[in-house]
Amino acid sequence: MAGGAREVLTLQLGHFAGFVGAHWWNQQDAALGRATDAKESPGELCPDVLYRTGRTLHGQDTYTPRLILMDLKGSLSSLKEEGGLYRDKQLDAAIAWQGKLTTHKEELCPKNPYLQDFLSAEGVLSSDGVWRVKSIPNGKGSPPLTTATTPKPLIPTEASIRVWSDFLRVHLHPRSICMIQKYNHDGEAGRLEAFGQGESVLKEPKYQEELEDRLHFYVEECDYLQGFQILCDLHDGFSGVGAKAAELLQDEYSGRGIITWGLLPGPYHRGEAQRNIYRLLNTAFGLVHLAAHSSLVCPLSLGGSLGLRPEPPVNFPYLHYDATLPFHCSAILATALDTVTVPYRLCSSPVSMVHLADMLSFCGKKVVTAGATIPFPLAPGQSLPDSLMQFGGATPWTPLSACGEPSGTRCFAQSVVLRGIDRACHTSQLTPGTPPPSSLHACTTGEEVLAQYLQQQQPRVMSSSHLLLTPYRVAPPYPHLFSSCSPQGMVLDGSPKGAAVESIPVFGALCSSSSLHQTLEALARDLTKLDLRRWASFMDAGVEHDDVAELLQELQSLAQCYHAGDSLVD
C-alpha cells in the first residue's frame, strides 16, 4: 500500500445499500479517471483509502474496491458472484472428479445494454476466456489500449435499472460479493423481512465464517487500517445483519472506527400496513443495536419521517427527482455520503474515523444527522461570501436523516464539507476602497470564510470544516436530476443551454442535533401503540417481548441524550 494511506474497509449490506454503493463506487471510479487531468486539483482525496491493488493469475494489475457486500439470491442480475475481473475458464474447468458428470445450466440474465457498452470500453474477453483490462486509472496497471474513435457512452434509462448491478461501472474482487442463498430478492415468499431473521443469518456458522474469512483477507493486507464503514439497509432484515456485523467488528477489531450509514428508501404509504410496521420495528431495533456497536451511526433517507406517519420526501431547489425510484434516491444519498466522508479520506491532514466519531458523539450521542445542499447555489460572477449570505440565518442544507426540518433545533457538534468551488471564487473580489458588505467579504481565504460563517450560524457549537476544490462528478450513469445548472453545476437563470451537467459543488454536514430527541421519542411512542400480538410473524423471527420492552427503554435513554439542554456549552 503506497503512501501510508489510512485504509477503510467498506461493508454493503442489503439491496438499497447496493444502489447507494453502486453510485458511490462509480463516483470513486470517475474521480480516478480524472486524476491525471491537468485541469483537476491533484491529491485532495486519497483513493488508496478505499481501494486495494492486486494482480490476477495472468499478471494483470488490478485496482478494486476494498469491499464486502451481502445481498439475497436473485439480486445480481447478470453480474457474477465472483465478479468479472479475475475470471478464468481454465480454472473453472479444473474438476477433480473423473466420473460421469451431468451439467445443469441456468439460463443467464440478459446484460443491461448500458453495461455491454461499458465493458466493451473497459476491456475484452479473449478466446482463452481471460478478461484483458485496457487500463487501470490513476497510473495503476498497464498502459491503456487506444482506439481510433471513442464511442459516446450509453446513458442508462430509469426503465432499464432493475437492480444495482445494472449500473455499476466498477469491477469487483472475487472476495467482495457474498450471497445469502436462503432468502430471495424477488417474490413474496422467502424474504428477509425482519430484524431477527437478519441477526440469525450471521449466527449461522456458514455465513459467519464466510464473513470472517473475507474480513481477514482484506484486513491482513492493510498497513494502517483506520476502520470500517457499513452501508446497511435499516427498513428490512438487513438491519439485523448490520447489527450483528457491527458487533463482530467491535469484538474482533477493538480500537478501530466503525461508522454505520443506515439507509432507508422512500417513500412509503399508509396502505401497506405490514410493510410499514416491519419498517418501524426494523429501523428502531437497527438504530439501537448499531449505536451500541458502532463508533457513529447516521440514518440516511429522503423521507420526512422515521415513524409510522408518512411525510413528503425532502425538496431540493435545483434538483428534480422521483422519490419512488431507488436509482434516483440512492444517487442523491451517495452524493451526500461522498461529501461528508471527505475528512477521513483526505491525502493531507486527514481526520481519522475514530477522531471524527469522538468529536460528534460525546455524552453518548452516537447517532448523528446528515444534511446537504445539492448543488451548492453559486451563480456566475458570485463569490463564496455572496452565496453564503443569501442563506441568511436559515440552515443551508436539506435534511437527509428523516428527522424533520432542522429549524428551531440545537446543534451540539458538526463536521462540514464544502467542495467544488473554484479558488477564484473563495473570497470577495471587491474594488479597492469598497467597504465589505459583511464580515465574510473581508476574509482573505476560503477556509476563513467557511469557518467564520459557521461561527456566525452556530456561535457556541464545536465545528470542524473542510473546503475542497474537487467537485462531485455527475456524468452517466448518474441520473439527469439537475435543472438550471451549467456543466460545472453553477446556478443559471432560466433553462440551461448546451452541454449536460458534468460536476457540481456540494455543501454537506454531519450534525449531533436536538432534532434526534423528538425523532427517537416519536419512534418509541409509535412502538408503544403497537399490538405485538398482531405481528407474531415478526416476533417469531427471533425477537422476544422482553426485547421490545428493552428496546423502548434504550430508545428513550438515547433520546434523552439529545435534550436541548445537554451540550458542551450553555
Residue ranges and their predicted role:
Residues A2-D570:
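Terminal, contiguous helix-loop blocks that mediate binding/assembly
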